[in-house]
């Protein structure tokens, strides 16, 4: 530590140069002699002090360390003393007392707690007392700020912690070193099958602890667009060459040739892709290739049978993704549950041959009822049919009445099934019509009558298009026709 000492002060004259002494001051003045200016520096090393003197400050700073070096070089090295049964650790000057307290507490697994015990004094000159507890040890410190009081408290408790006996030496458990499995012998002839020959050759040389292979380009030959490169590889006293359309392929071929020379198995080389595209050749089909396709031509006697099969698949495909709550798509199982298969249908829903003339008449009656509310065609049919009973005449405004009138004229049944109200407080009804083909629809409304009217209107629209099914509707599997959506 350097400590500058004040230099010798100059001796000043007591003579005043002012004009107060008289109008004519003396012409000559002889001041007292002034000694030369000296600087002194004090250097502390351990418990010893060394002084340096000089006329200028920089040389004095160098003089004090020089004297300290001359003195300390002749002294023997100090022995390391043991304090409390342990070697004294070198004190770190950059480490504060608070850090030392936390370090000791961490080693001994002790809790540390700092708290301000009390404050005193006026607001502009407060005095703080901080208490620190480290396990069972307690210390207090006082200061003009919380930081100073905390530091003094740590200093007080640090003296108590240093008196503790040393920690017992804990024997460290030696970690078990897991034996590594014996690595694959990279020098075996079968090692590296399918690996890049360049990497394989390098790994083999590393396993042998020999020098890695050296590659060198020998020549380039051929036309600019048909270049051929010749690469040479050297492993020890063995050399091999490889040719390729580019340097990478040539290097690979050279490595493969070197592996063959060294006695390693090399897979068969695959043909490289040509630089220029060749003309595509039409593949020649061998007998027996492909799938067999059989064509059937209907005979005149089978026309009725084929028409029946076609009619079984004539059915509009309507998505049931927008069905309301409680309505299921009309799959065969659901159709059996609601009774669609009763009547003219069997259990497997094989449909009887429909009558095109009857479908045309049904569509005509449905259109007349939709547009006019009355149907002269239905009235004529009902008059000719004695078993139909008395049917009231006049226009019919409700779709449910129109559908009932049509069912009486064409001889099919209409059945409604009501469901409980949904989460929107709406009624839902399902209608089942045993026409050809059977039709199923649903209706939604505020009451049951409006649900029946909506469902009947959907069925009437489908019936009015029966004569157009053969040309407009796609063919799907057997089953009843379902009409979805709100009208």
Swiss-Prot record:
Annotated GO MF terms: RNA binding
SMART domains, per database record: DSRM
Subcellular location field: Cytoplasm; Rough endoplasmic reticulum
Region (Disordered) location: 175-196, 270-310
Superkingdom assignment: Eukaryota
Residues that bear Asymmetric dimethylarginine: 20, 27
SUPFAM superfamilies reported for this sequence: dsRNA-binding domain-like
UniProt biased composition (Basic and acidic residues): 276-294
CC terms in the record's Gene Ontology section: cytoplasmic stress granule; dendrite; neuron projection; ribonucleoprotein complex; rough endoplasmic reticulum
Record-annotated DRBM domain positions: 96-163, 196-264
Keywords tagged on the record: Cytoplasm, Endoplasmic reticulum, Methylation, Repeat, RNA-binding
Residue numbers carrying Omega-N-methylarginine: 27
Chief location: cytoplasm
A Pfam family per the record: Staufen_C
Alphabetical GO biological process terms: dendritic transport of messenger ribonucleoprotein complex; intracellular mRNA localization
UniProt domain comment: One of the DRDB could be involved in RER binding.
Function: Binds double-stranded RNA (regardless of the sequence) and tubulin. May play a role in specific positioning of mRNAs at given sites in the cell by cross-linking cytoskeletal and RNA components, and in stimulating their translation at the site.
Subunit record text: Binds tubulin. Identified in a mRNP complex, at least composed of DHX9, DDX3X, ELAVL1, HNRNPU, IGF2BP1, ILF3, PABPC1, PCBP2, PTBP2, STAU1, STAU2, SYNCRIP and YBX1. Binds with low affinity single-stranded RNA or DNA homopolymers. Interacts with CASC3 in an RNA-dependent manner.
Family annotation (PANTHER family): DOUBLE-STRANDED RNA-BINDING PROTEIN STAUFEN HOMOLOG 1, MATERNAL EFFECT PROTEIN STAUFEN
Protein name: Double-stranded RNA-binding protein Staufen homolog 1
Protein's organism: Mus musculus (Mouse)
Lineage: Eukaryota, Metazoa, Chordata, Craniata, Vertebrata
Gene that specifies this protein: Stau1
């Amino acid at each position: 530590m350097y400590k500058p000492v004040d230099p010798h002060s100059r001796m000043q004259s007591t003579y005043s140069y002012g004009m107060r002494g008289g109008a004519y001051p003396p012409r000559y003045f002889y001041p007292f002699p002034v000694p030369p200016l000296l600087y002194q520096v004090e250097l502390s090393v351990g418990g010893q002090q060394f002084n340096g003197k000089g006329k200028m400050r920089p040389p004095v700073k160098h003089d004090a360390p020089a004297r300290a070096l001359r003195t300390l070089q002749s002294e023997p090295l100090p022995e390391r003393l043991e304090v409390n049964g342990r070697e004294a650790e070198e004190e770190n000057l950059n480490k504060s007392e608070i850090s030392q307290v936390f370090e000791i507490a961490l080693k001994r697994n002790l809790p540390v707690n700092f708290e301000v015990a009390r404050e005193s004094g006026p607001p502009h000159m407060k005095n703080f007392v901080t208490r620190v507890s480290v396990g069972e040890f307690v210390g207090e410190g006082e200061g003009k700020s919380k930081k100073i009081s905390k530091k003094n408290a740590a200093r007080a408790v640090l003296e108590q912690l240093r008196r503790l006996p040393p920690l017992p030496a804990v024997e460290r458990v030696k970690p078990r070193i897991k034996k590594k499995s014996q690595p694959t012998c990279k020098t075996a002839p079968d090692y590296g099958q399918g690996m890049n020959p360049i990497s394989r050759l390098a790994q083999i040389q590393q396993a042998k602890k020999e020098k890695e292979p050296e590659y060198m380009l020998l020549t380039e030959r051929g036309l600019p667009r048909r270049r051929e490169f010749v690469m040479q590889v050297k492993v020890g006293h063995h050399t091999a060459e490889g040719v390729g359309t580019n340097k990478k392929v040539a290097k690979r071929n050279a490595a493969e040739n070197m592996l063959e020379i060294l006695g390693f198995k090399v897979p068969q080389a695959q043909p490289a892709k040509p630089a220029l595209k060749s003309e595509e050749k039409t593949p020649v089909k061998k007998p027996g290739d492909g799938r067999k396709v059989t064509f059937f031509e209907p005979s005149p006697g089978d026309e009725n049978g084929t028409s029946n099969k076609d009619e079984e698949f004539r059915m509009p495909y309507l998505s049931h993704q927008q069905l309301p709550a409680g309505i299921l798509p009309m799959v065969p199982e659901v159709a059996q549950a609601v009774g669609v298969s009763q009547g003219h249908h069997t259990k497997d829903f094989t449909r009887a041959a429909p009558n095109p003339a009857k479908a045309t008449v049904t569509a005509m009656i449905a259109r007349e009822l939709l547009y006019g509310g009355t149907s002269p065609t239905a009235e004529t049919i009902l008059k000719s049919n004695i078993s139909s009973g008395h049917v009231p005449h006049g226009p019919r405004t409700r779709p449910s009445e129109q559908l009932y009138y049509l069912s009486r004229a064409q001889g099919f049944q209409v059945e409604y099934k009501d469901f409980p109200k949904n989460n929107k407080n709406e009624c839902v009804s399902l209608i089942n019509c045993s026409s050809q083909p059977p039709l199923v629809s649903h209706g939604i409304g505020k009451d049951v009558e409006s649900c029946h009217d909506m469902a009947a209107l959907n069925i009437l629209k489908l019936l009015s298009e029966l004569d157009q099914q053969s040309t407009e509707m796609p063919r799907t599997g057997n089953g009843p026709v379902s009409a979805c959506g709100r009208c």
